[in-house]
Structures are given as structure tokens and as C-alpha cells.
Amino acid sequence: MSDTEDNKNKQTTRRDFIVLTASSVAAVGAACAFWPIIDSFNPSADVLALSSIEVDLSNIAIGQTVTVKWQGKPIFITNRTHDEIAAARAVKMSELIDPERDEVRVKAGHDNWLVTIGICTHLGCVPLSHKGEYNGWFCPCHGSQYDSSGRVRKGPAPLNLAVPPYIFISDKKIRIG
């Protein structure tokens, strides 16, 4: 090999390194320049504060379901009877399309309160409460039936009614979101 060929290989390698380094610095600079623009798409603090709601449970009678709106979605809040709780806990997991124990769907110590997102998991219709074979919810669009724990028992719905994030602020008040 001649000195000229060795020099070309070294220059090519050196050139590749310089191009790679310059490209990396440019990419990091572009990311830093665009970060404020990307970050502006996140919701502001006042919008995040409105993303949670507080619901007073004291006016909901035993056996009654109330619907509230949270983030544009209907939320079913049900004050279940002892019979509804016992029936939901007696169901065998093998009978469920989407097996989930009743105890997992409610907060410990507040077994009578069931909070679910009121949207059918099949195609997004709003089910009717205290309807159907299982005394839970019935979706009039395609016939999905949910039990008193919001678990799908029959029909085309693949999943149980979703449980939104919520906490008990007191025995008679919850915060959803």
C-alpha cells in the first residue's frame, strides 16, 4: 500500500467522525429548540385541576345508580344492596367472559359503592342500568349484558365496564380522576 492510499483511508475515517459528531450536535440542538413547542401541547395546571371531579354520595339511596360526567364520559356510581354484593361475589370466575373478582372492582371498606365508566366495551354505547338478566347493565345497541359488578356476562362486549381512577375523600365523598 502506498502512503497516498493510507492517507485517503485516514481522511475518510476522520471525515466520517466529523460528520457523525456534527450531525449528533445538530440533532441535540434541534431537540432542545423544539422542546418548548412540544411541551406546550401538554395540558396546563388549570385544565389538569378540572380533570378530576368530586361527587357527594350522601344523596344516592341503596340500590340506586347515578350518572355523572367526567372527561366527557358517563360515570355510573351505584350504591349496591347486600343482595347485589352477595350475588356478584358468588359468581364463578369460569362463567365470566372477562374474569375479575368483585372485590377487585370496588375499594376495600366501601364494597357497596361501584364506580364504572358507563361505556359499553363493544362499540361505545351507553348501557341502561338495572336492566338485563343479571340486574346490572344492558347495552341496547348490541345486547351485551353486565352484572351488578359491571362484569360482562353475555353478548359481544369483550371486557368488563372499566373502573376509573377514584379515591374516597370521606365516607360520603369520592374524587374521580
Curated annotation (Swiss-Prot):
Q: Which reaction does it catalyse?
A: a quinol + 2 Fe(III)-[cytochrome c](out) = a quinone + 2 Fe(II)-[cytochrome c](out) + 2 H(+)(out)
Q: How does it sit in the membrane?
A: Single-pass membrane protein
Question: Which cofactor is essential here?
Answer: [2Fe-2S] cluster
Gene Ontology CC entries for this record: plasma membrane
Q: Which cysteines are joined by disulfide bonds?
A: 125-141
Enzyme Commission numbers on file: 7.1.1.8
List the Gene3D superfamilies. Answer: Rieske [2Fe-2S] iron-sulphur domain, Single helix bin
> Pfam families of this UniProt entry?
Rieske, UCR_Fe-S_N
Residues binding [2Fe-2S] cluster: 120, 122, 139, 142
Which InterPro entries does the record associate with it? Answer: Rieske_2Fe-2S (IPR017941), Rieske_2Fe-2S_sf (IPR036922), Rieske_Fe-S_prot (IPR014349), Rieske_Fe-S_prot_C (IPR005805), TAT_signal (IPR006311), TAT_signal_bac_arc (IPR019546), Ubiq_cytC_Rdtase_Fe-S_su_TAT (IPR019470), Ubiquinol_cyt_c_Rdtase_Fe-S-su (IPR006317)
All copies of domain Rieske, residue ranges: 88-175
Instruction: List membrane-spanning regions.
Output: 18-38
Q: What EC class is this?
A: translocase
GO terms (molecular function) for this protein are: 2 iron, 2 sulfur cluster binding; metal ion binding; ubiquinol-cytochrome-c reductase activity
Tell me which UniProt keywords the record has, alphabetically.
2Fe-2S, Cell membrane, Disulfide bond, Electron transport, Iron, Iron-sulfur, Membrane, Metal-binding, Translocase, Transmembrane, Transmembrane helix, Transport
Q: How is the cofactor bound here?
A: Binds 1 [2Fe-2S] cluster per subunit.
**What role is this protein assigned?**
Component of the ubiquinol-cytochrome c reductase complex (complex III or cytochrome b-c1 complex), which is a respiratory chain that generates an electrochemical potential coupled to ATP synthesis.
> Other remarks?
The Rieske protein is a high potential 2Fe-2S protein.
User: What is stated as this protein's family in its record?
Assistant: Belongs to the Rieske iron-sulfur protein family.
- Subunit: The main subunits of complex b-c1 are: cytochrome b, cytochrome c1 and the Rieske protein.
Name of protein = Ubiquinol-cytochrome c reductase iron-sulfur subunit
The source organism is Rickettsia prowazekii (strain Madrid E)
